[in-house]
Amino acid sequence: TVTATHAGKSATCTVTQSAGEITYGAWKVTITANPTTIAAAGGTSTLTYSAVRDVLTNGVVTSTEKATPTVSGSATGFTRSGATVTAANNTSASSRSVTYTATHGGKSATCTVTQSAGSKQYGSWSAWTVSVSANPTTIARTGGTSTITASATRTRTWTWNGVSGSGGTESEKGTPALSASGSGFTLSGTTLT
C-alpha cells in the first residue's frame, strides 16, 4: 500500500503481486557400474544411481529435488544386493552380462555389467601308470598261447579360471610297447606263444 500525503490530506493505493508459481522439470535418471567388466573367476561391481529434477519458481530454477530410483534386472550368474553386483565363477567358455534399469517418475536409464569368458586351467600330468596281465598265466607243457593285455594311463586335474573345486580330473590313455623275454616264447602282437 502506498500513501500520498499533502496539506493534511492523504490518499492510498495498493499494489498486489501474484502468488509465485512452483513448477518442476522432468526427472533425469542415471545409473552406472564400476567396474563394467568382472573377471571370469568372479567378483563385484558397484552401481551408482540417482534421479534429479529441477524446481522452478516463476520459471527460474531455484533448487533441485532428488529421489532414489527403482533398480531392476537379473541374469544367470549374477546377484544384486543393494548397489553391489556379484558375479559367480563363470564355468562357461562364453562371456555373459546383465543389464540393470533404474526407473523413476516415468524416466529410466540402463547400464550393463559384463563378465569375461571362463577358461579351463590345467595342472600337470601325473606319471604314467602301466599295467600288464596275461590270460592264462600258465601254458601247458605241450605248448599253447596266452593273451597279453596292457594299458597305460595318466591323469591331470583342471579348474574353471583357477577356482578350487570348480573342475575335475581327466585321463589320457597310451599304448605300451610289449616285449617278451625267456627261452621258448615268442610274442606276436598281444599273443604270447
Where are these regions (language model features)?
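Extracellular/luminal low-complexity segments enriched in Ser/Thr/Pro
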Residues: 1, 82-97, 191-193
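A short beta-strand micro-motif common to beta-rich folds, especially ectodomain repeats
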Residues: 1-8, 94-106
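Low-complexity/repetitive intrinsically disordered segments
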Residues: 1-27, 188-193
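Residues on the solvent-exposed faces and adjacent turns
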Residues: 6, 17, 89, 104, ...
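Extracellular and select intracellular beta-sandwich modules with Ser/Thr-enriched
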Residues: 8-13, 106-112
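Solvent-exposed, low-complexity, repeat-rich "mucin-like" stalks and linkers
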Residues: 12-16, 20-21, 25-70, 118, ...
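Low-complexity "stalk/linker" and mucin-like segments enriched in Ser/Thr/Pro/Ala/Gly
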Residues: 68-83, 139, 167-192
